[in-house]
Amino acid sequence: MRTIRATIALLALGFAASLAAAVHLVPVVGGLASPVFAGNAGDGSGRLFIVEQGGVIRVLQSGAATVSVFLDIRSKVIAGGERGLLGLAFHPQYASNGRFFVYYTRSGDGTIIVAEYGTLSDRNIASAIETTLLAIPHPINANHNGGMLAFGRDGYLYIGVGDGGSANDPPDNAQNLESLLGKILRIDVDRTASGLRYALPPDNPFVNTPGRDEIYAYGLRNPWRFTFDRVTDVLWVADVGQNAREEVNMPVVRGGNYGWRAYEGSSCTGNDPPLCNPANYRFPVLEYAHDEGRCSITGGSVYRGNRQSLPGGTYVFADFCSGEIFAWDGTAQTVLLDTPGNISSFGEDEHGEIYVVDLGGTVSRLAAATSCTYAIAPARETFAIAGGAGSIAVTAGDSCAWTAATGDAWITLGGAAEGTGNGTVTYAIAPYTGKPKVRTGTIVVAGNTFTITQNRLRLLVRGGG
């Protein structure tokens, strides 16, 4: 039975209207080099780890404004386009064992590597010792590398691998059960099997049957980002489309076939018309067309945070090309925010708050819009004939933006005349030789009016209130 499908249309529903007005982005850190992922270690430290495509993982301490290097493997990585250091996952017992895992494309031949690392006694610095778990050949095309790693509640490591690239998956890797390309894989990193540095979960769907034992689900084009709902443990996979459709698959289940390359979203592609039998596939719960500048989905997190920034269970995702951030509650969806960036990923902190990663170099937190109040001091000033300069102190909440403006040509505002949170507006007053003897002007700061009086007397009187 087909699951419910939805298209990204702006719906005039209470859900859409309320969410669009309810959230904003709070800058966390900038100056990064092509960040593609952010996440937490689950160790209670409050740290945020940020993956840069070129081969560096940086760590942001709780409450800090700058990052430090956690791991640098640039010498191992080929980066650019869809290649690079692409994924990071911490072992569920990282707090005690210091183990974590990375996904990258290897310099020289483009092979996809899933590798294990550890940390030094200083948990802010990783060991340089690498243990390669998987090496998946990807020699021909530079695109569709996948790149996501995440642990499920079952303790197994899930791995998202692209179909090998080029248009329309020419070798049909996504449907080939003897290939690891175009799949979600699942492995046990706490045990080993003969000839492997990992073990196979005994309930993987193709254990002891034709097909690679590592495969968990298949029929995917480029599952760049996926997430587990931290409450239900349901697996959501956002699959990047070809030329027409972007899709979200949920639940992604053991042995599920999600249709590529026979289907793109719920539409038969024409690549294999005889195979377009809906009974053989699981279809997306959500899909959208390539219009209005949209072209590539970036999944996605299910909001379960403590700050109540969004209703619990809301799925948040984006389009890399349009910069839009979307929200979906299972029945209705909306454009949550329209950003100017290229959103490469979402991440979560230990408390379930969602972070937005922009390939341009920033990480921001999705937060409930603040009810902002503003105050200024003083409220007025008086100047004599010679004019002069002054300043206005602005008091505002940390994430509350404000601007200052004047319509009087003899008042000149200094600096940017805008800010966020507490700040200062500076201004200059021109000499006055005209008529009448007194003139009055105003500066409006965040809705508050600051009044300036100037007269032709040479006595300067200044006061506030």
Place the predicted regions along the sequence by residue.
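Beta-propeller domain segments
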Residues: 51, 83-85, 93-95, 163-332, ...
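Surface-exposed binding patches on compact interaction domains or structured appendages
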Residues: 375-376, 398-426
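A short beta-strand micro-motif common to beta-rich folds, especially ectodomain repeats
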Residues: 437-447
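Enriched but not universal
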Residues: 2, 7, 457-465
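Solvent-exposed, low-complexity, repeat-rich "mucin-like" stalks and linkers
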Residues: 377-403, 455-457
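Conserved blade-ending motifs and adjacent loop-strand segments that build the rim/top face
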Residues: 332-350
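Bacterial N-terminal signal peptides
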Residues: 7-18
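Acidic, Gly/Ser/Thr-rich repeat motifs that build Ca2+-stabilized beta-propeller blades
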Residues: 20-168, 225-228, 233-241, 293-330, ...
